[in-house]
Amino acid sequence: MAYPELDAADFLQQLARRKEFKSLISPPVDQKELIRDLRAHFVQIGGPGCEKGGRAFFPCDPYASPFPSIKGLQLHNAQLFVQNFQNPNTPYSRLLLNWQTGTGKSIAAIAIARQFMNHYMNFIENAPWIFVVGFTRAIIQTEMLRRPELGFVSYKEVAELHRLLHIAKQSGSTTSVESRHLNGFVSTLKRRLTDRNRGGFFQFYGYKEFASKLFNITSKGEEKNFDVLSLFHRSDEAEDTLNENDISQFVQKISEAETNGLIRVNQKIMEQLRGGLLIADEIHNVYNIQERNNYGIALQYVLDAFPPHQAPRAVFMSATPVTGSVMEYVDLLNLLVPRHELPNGQPLQRQQLFDSSGHSVKWKKDALALVERLSTGRVSFLLDTNTNFYPERIFAGKMLSYKDEKLPYLHFIECPMSEYQLETLKQLGPDPKISSNAYSIYDMVFPNPKFSKQTEPKAYGLFNSTETPTALSMASTDWLLENGVQIIEPSRRAPFNVSGSFLSLQPPTHISGLAFYSGKYTQMMKDILSIIRQGRGKILIYHNRVRMSGVLILQEILQSNGILNEVSSPVGTTRCSICAAIRDDHTHSDHQFIPVRFTILHSEIEPAVRERSLALFNASSNLEGHQLRILIGSKVIVEGLNFQAVRYEMIMSLPLDIPRLIQVFGRVVRKNSHMELPPSERNVTIYLYVSTTPDGGPELAKYAQKLKEYILIQEGDKALRKHAIDGFTNQIKIDKPMLESLPLSPSITPANVGATVLNTFEAYGYGEQEVKTISNIIISLFMARPVWTYSELWKAVSTPKLIQGITIDNKLFSEDNFALALISLCYSKNQCKELWIQNRLCTIMHVPAKPEHLYVAAVLNHKKEPVLDIETYIRDFQPPTMHSIRITKYLEHSQTKEPFQVLYEKFQKDFQDEPMEQVLIHYPASFHYTMLEALIIDNLAGMGALVEVYKKFFIAFSKKDIQPFPDIFKIISHVPGDDNTLVGYATEDSVRLITSREDKTWHEIPLYMLNINVKRKENDIVIGYMESKGKALKFKIRPPIQVLKKNEITDIRMLNRGAVCETRGREEQQKIANQLGISLNLTKISAIKLCLLIRNNLLQKEMEARNQPNGMQDGIRWFYLFNDKMPSLVHTS
């Protein structure tokens, strides 16, 4: 066997010596030394002193990164390691990726899968399948379809996908033509992954779906209420625990149940998995003791049902493989280690690893050594806190003690319970046990209708989720008013919730406010206001629950203290996102009032709505949080969701355990999550709130208990990782104590790896991959420096970390492979490798010279021939192109659209004598957006009348228009031109402001920052708008939204969404015209002309409404123009 077997005494040593693994030891390099290397090779392209460091070959940016880089996705060393380890050429059957959150587990799994797919493509028939199972399967699919480097889509298809995504977003509707185009395109790409006739090898399942499709309960089984779990769990125990006497027989038991006609195993799935690959994400979910399910049973069955040589290979992924209980190690190891390699060939049982007495559990003697032995060669472990890529994690607060014992790792914001909370807690007795329906006591209590005044002696609050809704719902109206409580109308998503001034920091004098009912939430609100006053930065608030004291009440607390949801309009008590002052008291002259807004994510919100809110929160235009400052999330955010540029995380309740708490931290501390922020702001401050009493309190006791359990889990984690396959490559990252890991000293270190072994490197094609890597490095070096000698180039290529993103050990590169890479890039008459270098189309030329041959980045002329002379690297020989105005990213997609140049010529011809306002309704959005950018960037002559129309409708903005908004004016103040110079225009979602005409760069701000309200009230008569119908734009009308909402529609087909005006009945057309005040003899006018009159009248009224004082904020809506977002019309009854 070319690779060592796992049971070899020196397995890790043999593995580490092979070049495909040894080269992934990232050599330590001092930053100052690295800058010296850059300057020695004259390739510093940015940073202080870059012109000198780069010999001024090309313009450089002193504020940019100094390192040349390779465009596109580059697998990091850990991803390359597992790709090389778990592939068809190695004998290793199962692997756990135990990687810190945000380090690229999904990309690693896809890279592994790609190797197997390439192998399966050589099968003539009965090729196996790759199964991807998990709650985050959609994320993995998304990664596959947005990364052309992974080999599932082309660069052109990714560009088309981005274009369709943008157009669909601009349409504002999930049922629009644009959205249907997008969905169709995505479906086509996804079918390529799963349809064998199209070259697909993948099957995607959720855990529940996989288990239910694998085990089909027959009608006989349903009659007998058969449950697959009954084969594996004792029915006579209170807790759901594995029946260890039966688990070793579970394959046989399934067969018996199948013979008895109770169950039918899906043989199609079994055959697809035979010799295939199984990828299971967030593997801890399949055996979590606290959440009973049959997910793990299904996985265990498909892994154990085959003979070893036919069983599927498996890749498991989790940042926290053991969560709810340390005893889950038994279940993890049974999945990770093939049955025949376990002790005595039988599944592990808990008594083999643990001593338990009551609720006390501890590791048995030698149990950790057994974990070390069984996990050798089956675990990849990665921690990464490199602040070049990850934000710094800062914990606010202090460490606390419980019963004189210091709690390890965590810092807390201590929140003493209010007197009312303490009085309520007394009702549970001296040593309270908090049941699952009493969790609100940790956070707050609610007013109790049993007491007319909550301040009277011995009064106590409500907290039980069964009793509280009933008691408050039955309270009298007078009591509710007296105590500042408002019952929110129940809905499917929120059967019960309350609001009112009792949640305010500053309630009316006769009402007890938030501080009376919750010390924790009072401190949270104070911290939020303090953060806002300190400056910019987005905030994520986490609570494990939705109802009672969970995210729904947090939403009401924010609203009761002047913070708006996504759609509400500001009022006098609304707070400013910049200074936290309320609107009525906002006297700051240095900034405009911008309301603080929040959004909310929980499992009962529709996925499409969650995705939209998340996208807005993460958008680059919301980097400072001025569109959405705060996101409140429940446990739905713990896995699979990523948040960008969050500066503050507030954790209001402990998730089920400490490993899940680590997952919550990982939502906001992710690789490159803060790269758009200045370096000084690339950090996340974490606030961990805990309610306390004079003797500690039940919530602190809960943390103390979970931390004790976590210490046991950490001991198991350390044993699991002791012989990690890549420990020797990650030594400097894993040898420090931290919350995620005890300090770990790998059994193999970089210093004792030994001599390099090349046999598998050369046999399995890694040399070809090295040639590709070197080629990419060469191209990057030529982008920084246009002329090299052979020896200079080889020295630069073999210098570690000279290229950003390449962290392998370049010193192990073969010079033969370097020569091959260089030859493959050099120009020949039969082959021209085209490169874009500093926006010039170039190729690399080999120039024979003495004493040493030169290699030059030569510019290509219009015939694609290299032009080589002393100034070749600065001469710009680009192929001649027709001059045309730039088509912007707002160009809408439709095969029937005419090119802009054609429409432009038509516009010049048609509107010589016509009212210029008509241009707004005769041309599509693509024309207008392109025209607007041409007016702003190219300053087209003879367009004064059109500019005035755009300005009258508040579509285009001059410097003068922006001056009343000082903070915004700073963005464009440097742009050349007088007060009347156009500097921006409005789209459906934002205002685009030009920042550089030369570079064609733009800055986007929300519409509301220029007092543009996208949800102006509609008039009570009729609404007009234009819609594309083939090449034509059709005028359509519909009733106003408020009229639609009043109508009781029982059949969704009768919902009046709008129709072409000419198709309306004559009576309806005349009625609308009369209501609009069109005073003509309508009986003698054709339907077409009547609709033209209605259209022009609505357009005129729209212009007049917009030009009223504050018209773009409060004016009545009559007509939706090309850049207006139409409201979604849906049936809600």
Curated annotation (Swiss-Prot):
Task: Report the Pfam families cross-referenced here.
Answer: Helicase_C
Q: Induction of this protein: by what?
A: Expressed in the late phase of the viral replicative cycle.
The record places domain Helicase ATP-binding at 52-352
EC assignment: 3.6.4.13
Which part of the chain is the Helicase C-terminal domain?
524-724
Annotated localization = Virion
Q: What class of enzyme is it?
A: hydrolase
Q: What is its main location?
A: virion
| Gene3D superfamilies associated with the record | P-loop containing nucleotide triphosphate hydrolases (3.40.50.300)
The short motif DEAH box is annotated over 281-284
Q: What residues does ATP bind to?
A: W99, Q100, T101, G102, T103, G104, K105, S106
Against SMART domains, the record matches this protein to: HELICc (SM00490)
Mention one GO molecular function.
ATP binding
Q: Which family does it belong to?
A: Belongs to the DEAD box helicase family. DEAH subfamily.
So what does this one do?
A: Putative initation factor.
- Protein name, please? Early transcription factor large subunit homolog
Could you tell me which species this protein originates from? African swine fever virus (isolate Tick/South Africa/Pretoriuskop Pr4/1996)
Q: What is the lineage of its organism?
A: Viruses, Varidnaviria, Bamfordvirae, Nucleocytoviricota, Pokkesviricetes
